Amino acid sequence: GLARAARLGITSVHNMDGDEAQVLRYLALHEAGEMTLRVYVPYSVTPATPLAELQEAAAWRTRFHTSHVRAGAIKLFMDGVLESYTALMVEPYADAPGNCGSALFSTEHFAAIAVEADRLGLQIFVHACGDGAVRRTLDGYAHARRVNGQRDSRHRVEHIEVIHPDDMARFARLGVIASMQPLHAPLTRHSAEVWPARAGQARWPLSFAWQTLRQAGAHLALGSDWPVVTMNPLAGFHAALNREPWRDDDPVQRQTLAQTIAGYTHDAAYAEFQEHEKGQLRTGMLADMVLLSEDIFATPVADIARVHPLLTICHGRIVFAE
């Protein structure tokens, strides 16, 4: 995994495993001088996790804090995915009347977790694909802010495959980060299998709504969700830059090259409170960088996936050279 990431020019990841054994493996690799990237690992929380266990998640913040291995967040699954009707929807699935999917956490249960995690200063990551799951997550974040007061929490919603228009402005208002994955969105409705039918045409305008969220003031961070899709950032670039509206009157959600670069670099660093440390090539920033085979500003967007790294540097050390 590390060697593949280095070949693909990746110098930082957010590993959603949330497993202590995994973090300890990263630490051992770091102490042996073999870590080729930086990793931020949230603590996994399930419906069976006692509220008191969040103290252990908070302890991870100081227990795992090196140049290459960091913690300080929790990760939950609010729902599943649209393909299997397990994503929580506000209205029923277009091709399954009466079925709104399901959630792993009740409104009250998640609100209690959000309040306690926020009180402990933890960042919260929540997998939410359906618009109902996105809403329930935002409701929990809003409740935590009311109880604990406002702070720079940068809680996150992961995926946001569908969003209800009433919830669009809440990301900016609550300071919540939209963590999204360009490769999840079908480039056209014809390149998908069941997803467009599950959502239905009424929800297409706000499906994978990258640009609409940006216009509403949300901070976006872009990533892969590997191993669900390839971890190759340039494949993600291709998806972000070449996406077409599914209907002529749907909003254009494709990203500009500048937005895409920022989403994978500076904005992703912002999503882990590291924007002053990495994510830009500037004096005083960490020496994490990649040399590409072509000038991506001169490469046609249709051909962007052919670009590949020639050199990857992490922490000032060459970790890959072609």
Which role does the model predict for each range below?
Residues 3, 11-12:
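Short acidic/polar active-site loop segments enriched in Thr and Asp
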Residues 11, 37-38, 69, 151-155, ...:
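Residue-level recognition of the N-termini of beta-strands and the immediately preceding loop/turn
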Residues 19-135, 139, 147, 170-183, ...:
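Metal-coordinating catalytic core of metallo-dependent amide/deamination hydrolases
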Residues 62-63, 300-304:
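Short proline/glycine-enriched turn/loop segments at secondary-structure junctions
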Residues 106, 299-300:
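Residues that cap or delimit alpha-helices
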Residues 115-125, 129-155, 160, 165, ...:
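His/Asp/Glu-enriched, well-ordered alpha-helical/loop segment
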